[in-house]
Amino acid sequence: MPDALPPCSILILAGGRGQRMGGRDKGLVDWQGEPLIAHVHRAVRPLSDDLVISCNRNQAAYQAYADRLVGDAEADFPGPLAGVIAGLRVARHAWVVVLACDAPLVDRELIEGLLRLAVAGNSAAMVRQGGFWQPMFSVLPKRVLPVLEQAWAAGERSLQKALLREAVQGLECAESDRRLSNFNSPERLQD
């Protein structure tokens, strides 16, 4: 396989309720003096000319970190699957990196590893950590959009279950891999 990676879109999911954060918008919560979204943005910006953020509130604050914003088609924070569907609909490239807004330690090496794996297998790639899938660290071919839309129409709301309807390559990561840390509670922000 050639070293050159194909162009990809980046989709950052920031559309949740933030229940474990007391209802605060996780992407805009400060960590080390900056919003969590700023840390993720810094890691991914050099990798794509198409950075999409899925958010359902605070659009003005997120606009500074994205080329485009999308919201869920349904109200009331329907979950990450809805955000992925919305993002895939507008993505400009055939490959889409999916990340959460509350993973400030993600790095280029992890993203490029996922992208290489996806391209080599011509299928989705997702992190596996400690035997568990981590769908918020994945690369999807845009062509899975109809599969995800069908899953949604059939009542599926789990991003992981919807993605596993198709072939998925697993990128094994250690349980202690800090790059996969989700800062989704006030306690985690103390790390």
Curated annotation (Swiss-Prot):
CDD domains: MobA. GO terms for molecular function: GTP binding; metal ion binding; molybdenum cofactor guanylyltransferase activity. GO terms for cellular component: cytoplasm. GO terms for biological process: bis(molybdopterin guanine dinucleotide)molybdenum biosynthetic process. Keywords: Cytoplasm, GTP-binding, Magnesium, Metal-binding, Molybdenum cofactor biosynthesis, Nucleotide-binding, Transferase. It is found in: Cytoplasm. Pfam families: NTP_transf_3. Mg(2+) binds at residue 102. Its EC number is 2.7.7.77. It catalyses: Mo-molybdopterin + GTP + H(+) = Mo-molybdopterin guanine dinucleotide + diphosphate. The keyword Cytoplasm applies. GTP binds at residues 13-15, 26, 72, 102. Its cofactor is Mg(2+). It is an enzyme of class 2 (transferase). Monomer. Belongs to the MobA family. Transfers a GMP moiety from GTP to Mo-molybdopterin (Mo-MPT) cofactor (Moco or molybdenum cofactor) to form Mo-molybdopterin guanine dinucleotide (Mo-MGD) cofactor. The N-terminal domain determines nucleotide recognition and specific binding, while the C-terminal domain determines the specific binding to the target protein. This is Molybdenum cofactor guanylyltransferase. It comes from Pseudomonas putida (strain ATCC 47054 / DSM 6125 / CFBP 8728 / NCIMB 11950 / KT2440). The lineage of its organism: Bacteria, Pseudomonadati, Pseudomonadota, Gammaproteobacteria, Pseudomonadales. The gene is mobA.
